């Protein structure tokens, strides 16, 4: 583990700004793909369907929203890191399985045609977006482990590089795909997923030396860093994010029953 330097406002600010970009990047990249999706067969209505699948994906992913903070608290030695990695894998498997469930019959009909009042064609787009979005959501979960290692070693700048690459790739895809005729929900999801996978690979690359150093440390698991302890710590941290992600879904359910609902839902997603 890197020896922590003396505390100072300037040093804290330099550590914080890259972390701020991590959160800001999500708000920036998702609207960028709107230009890809809206040039699909169903136009702006395709973005509406795409958005419903994405919103459910984000809500399910919010159950793991506290994992990052959990890792920064517990994954500071070998045993804590190994147990955090196990917890992250278990929660990823459970939540990705939960993400697939609403995309499978008969639940997909209940959710997208019943809950969001989408036509069968648009409901199919939303279903496929949710189902194939497991790759994107999975990359976010896998990124937790190396990202925690970088943050715990005060290397938020290196994490920032990976995030900047994701943003650049998404911007490039948003500009290039429509010119090549690659439009619609599928290419839009691919543009988002590509950036996430590349970001994951870069983050793992930067974290490798720090991970080797961490695994070389002695230490045994105990009740203070057990998987169950870390899980109980994660749940309250995730709860606030879950409530935030439920809000747009509840709003979308109301909007879907208004005149010109498809147009309004597309705007709701972008904003």
Could you tell me what each predicted segment is?
Residues 16, 20-32, 56-70, 137-145, ...:
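Hydrophobic alpha-helical transmembrane bundles that constitute the permease/transmembrane domains
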Residues 21, 33, 37, 50, ...:
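Hydrophobic/aromatic residues within transmembrane alpha-helices of membrane transport systems
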Residues 27-48, 113-117, 180-181, 238, ...:
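Helix-terminus/linker motif at the lipid-water interface of multi-pass membrane proteins
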Residues 38-44, 74-82, 152-155, 184-185, ...:
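A short glycine-centered flexible hinge/capping loop motif at secondary-structure junctions
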Residues 82-85, 149-176, 186-189:
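Alpha-helical transmembrane segments of multi-pass membrane transporters/permeases
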């Amino acid at each position: 583990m890197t020896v922590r330097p003396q505390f100072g406002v300037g040093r804290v600010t330099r550590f914080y700004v890259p972390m701020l970009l991590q959160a800001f990047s999500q708000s920036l990249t998702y609207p960028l793909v709107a230009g890809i999706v809206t040039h699909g067969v169903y136009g702006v209505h395709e973005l509406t369907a795409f958005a419903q699948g994405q919103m459910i994906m984000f809500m399910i992913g919010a159950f793991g929203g506290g994992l990052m903070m959990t890792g920064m608290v517990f994954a500071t030695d070998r045993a804590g890191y190994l147990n955090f990695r196990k917890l992250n894998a278990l929660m990823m498997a459970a939540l990705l399985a939960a993400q697939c469930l609403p995309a499978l019959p008969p639940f997909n009909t209940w959710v997208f045609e019943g809950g969001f009042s989408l036509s069968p064609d648009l409901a199919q787009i939303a279903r496929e977006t949710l189902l194939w979005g497991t790759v994107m959501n999975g990359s976010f979960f896998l990124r937790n482990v190396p990202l925690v290692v970088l943050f715990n070693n005060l290397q938020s700048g290196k994490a920032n590089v990976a995030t900047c690459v994701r943003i650049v790739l998404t911007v490039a895809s948003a500009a290039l795909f429509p010119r090549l005729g690659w439009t619609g929900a599928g290419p839009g999801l691919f543009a988002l997923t590509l950036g996430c996978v590349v970001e994951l690979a870069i983050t793992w690359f930067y974290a490798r030396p720090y991970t080797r150093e961490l695994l070389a440390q002695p230490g045994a698991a105990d009740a203070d860093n057990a998987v169950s302890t870390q899980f109980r710590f994660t749940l309250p941290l995730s709860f606030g994010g879950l409530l935030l992600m439920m809000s747009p879904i509840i709003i979308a359910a109301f909007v879907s029953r208004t005149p010109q609902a498809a147009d309004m839902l597309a705007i709701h997603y972008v904003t």
